Amino acid sequence: MNQNQISSYINQANEELEAATLLLEKNYYRACISRCYYAIYCTVQALLIVKNINTRSHRGVRQQFSQHFIQTGELPLELSKALRITYDLRQLGDYDQVIEITREQTQIA
């Protein structure tokens, strides 16, 4: 387990969450969702490193998180759902310029 990597991911997660809060206050919903996703992503990466699991893709992070934390019952299913929903919203916000992202969707993230 690399404590420096874990600390780095946790620090980045906190920074992303703080940025998301500021973006929500300014009604920048697309950017807010993206920052929310990365806050969760960094937190999950830190958890995976604790178990000496390294991944190189977003999909791998979601799969490994589910396998090692959700399916084992160590963490509740709702966390996996939150990761998936936030990932899906980020994909829409980042890559589908036609769709409108609402405050309600942002608050789900």
Residue ranges and their predicted role:
Residues 1-109:
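Terminal alpha-helical segments
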